[in-house]
């Protein structure tokens, strides 16, 4: 296919193995690659934007293959994509890729994911965007994950990529010959037991460290067509999960089940 202008970001930071593998894979396929990503890890920042302090950027070409332009940014993943589109790029990209994330982005976890937020920022600007994650914090075959991501992205660009569609790709942590299939999936509902570790700093003041433990994964529930497999069940079966996500969060249920709100208080004397 024709060479694409591709913007790549992430939430693991400019030194992460995943983003370098993804940029390398895109370059090998003949595409023009620009990287704008956080200058350090900013996982689980959601779609946060930096409003109370300046954004600073520094060139980081030396961390990537020759021919790749790269910047490390002091902001969030969403900041990085917004800044790239507004200031750093000469022209609007044909494709935005976010990842490869070190760990899964499944189910309702996407609401706090910086990886997904970077792709969502591109989607909001009508640029075809995909978030890519390896569903393990220990598995390091990012080259394989990047190869899968590029093949999917190129096919989607060539065929039909609707406006407002974000593709959320999760790859199981296993070798190529162990992967069974790729399927469209729906989002699961994942819930956590929030565990705060209370500690004391050298000055005697308390502080808290958050670590979430997944205690409930409602694979049978969630969003999307019920005859589609859930993203979590797909990964558990060593299958690639590709979930279509859109920007529209509007309630799709019946008006009859919404709370009854009496607005008489508005004009009350």
From Swiss-Prot:
Alphabetical list of SUPFAM superfamilies matching this protein: SurE-like (SSF64167)
Domain of life: Bacteria
Source organism (scientific name): Prochlorococcus marinus (strain MIT 9515)
PANTHER family: 5'-NUCLEOTIDASE SURE, 5'_3'-NUCLEOTIDASE SURE
Catalytic activity: a ribonucleoside 5'-phosphate + H2O = a ribonucleoside + phosphate
Gene3D superfamilies: Survival protein SurE-like phosphatase/nucleotidase
Principal location listed in the UniProt entry: cytoplasm
Keywords: Cytoplasm, Hydrolase, Metal-binding, Nucleotide-binding
Cellular component GO terms, alphabetical: cytoplasm
Enzyme class label: hydrolase
Family stated for the protein in its record: Belongs to the SurE nucleotidase family.
Residues annotated as binding a divalent metal cation: 11-12, 43, 101
Subcellular location(s) of the protein: Cytoplasm
Gene: surE
Name of this chain's protein: 5'-nucleotidase SurE
Cofactor notes: Binds 1 divalent metal cation per subunit.
